[in-house]
């Protein structure tokens, strides 16, 4: 057997993205949750201390600073290798009043408000579809609804949780006044987002007391349908209906319809999930505990089991996932190794990799109002460049390089233009006698120049003689086309026909026609011999028409 090629290529290096962050928010206290405003450049973060911060960022200022730092680094480096440099803005959240007081709003980051919102850590953050209100839940099981721009609490409630579990996930309906929360014991509660009153409850959704890892909307089925992920299963249910009747059914009863539809056991923890296109809802992707993405298709098997797997990172976990929302069949997923992967679900492979941190895992992913990726860990949040911004940056660099090359070549072009003017003056003085020559190409092509001059002179002499001997008006169109065809036939015929009288020319043409008609008759006889039988003609396709080589000559009665 031949030896296998063991050349190893690091796929991460090949797929490493050229996109950079435009902003990095650093936290000295552990970060537990983040949420991005759907319509403005606002990001809200919740910490383990119970504090909630609301910041506004200026994309134009941050992008300009990034470009300036990159240019400055290139000019200062002078081709020398150096350590990794952060070109983007780094903003310390906790020490902002000390370290960033002199920069103010010019830094591109502005603190809108901060407050001690909960006793204990902030567990969940959710925003309205228009970004007017923000909902937060802490380990104190207190739900608060506040205005995003002011931070003022407009309504709050104490969520009764008899089993003592803490809330792990909260989702706000994009179209209706529904607020859905899941806890560590597999319980889902549905609240009215206006009154914060409970309207429905589902218990033990995932095989007992398994925690709710993720909840997202199943809009393709119904505006009230939602999907939850817990432990090793996927479930979907109606937010208006309780599942108490499911516990009265026999566990082995597979015919009765249940309120909660549960998938097969995946034998691995299902941590996060999303639809590739939430509006279409044809492909569902889940992040697994073993570093694999599983692809589900509701129309194929009603979410009973996965249909495809995409390998992301071996011996790692996929902790968070969001769609790109760019109509490219791709999703972003955050991994425990600190990388962000862009996976093409249609191709079934990773197409781009970005590094969030070499020391921390990626716990949160979100998209800002302009579909930029936001990644978060325990100590920092990064807002990344979009692909359009990177392409515009490359175009600007190319235009600058072109302008530099043009400015460098101005002196050369001026000297060349002066020399060209001198040459033009010399050629004008020498070329006055040759100005009447048409199509003189001796300067362009030296080889064959004499032949081209002789041919052109013969053509011009022939045209002059023809115009003197016979007027152009007396020539017939058919005879003109016939002469063209005869000229294309053979060189010997051209030598014989030149200088013949009208009668001799007609006689020569008649002889050619007789010979061609005899040849056509012989071809027809051969064709009849080779004609297929009637039985075989049924199986034949259309036959191309035979080529007619009669030079287009039909009649000479009028000559």
Curated annotation (Swiss-Prot):
One of its GO terms (cellular component) is nucleolus. InterPro entries: WD40/YVTN_repeat-like_dom_sf (IPR015943), WD40_repeat_dom_sf (IPR036322), WD40_rpt (IPR001680). It is found in: Nucleus, Nucleolus. Residues 391-417, 482-494 have a biased composition (Acidic residues). Keywords: Nucleus, Repeat, WD repeat. Residues 386-500, 515-559 are annotated as: Disordered. Residues 535-544 have a biased composition (Basic residues). GO terms for biological process: positive regulation of transcription by RNA polymerase I; ribosomal large subunit biogenesis; rRNA processing. WD repeats lie at residues 26-67, 77-116, 117-156, 162-201, 207-247, 265-306, 313-347, 354-394, 428-470. Residues 418-428, 520-534 have a biased composition (Basic and acidic residues). Pfam families: WD40. The keyword Oxidoreductase does not apply. Belongs to the WD repeat WDR55 family. This is WD repeat-containing protein JIP5. It comes from Vanderwaltozyma polyspora (strain ATCC 22028 / DSM 70294 / BCRC 21397 / CBS 2163 / NBRC 10782 / NRRL Y-8283 / UCD 57-17).
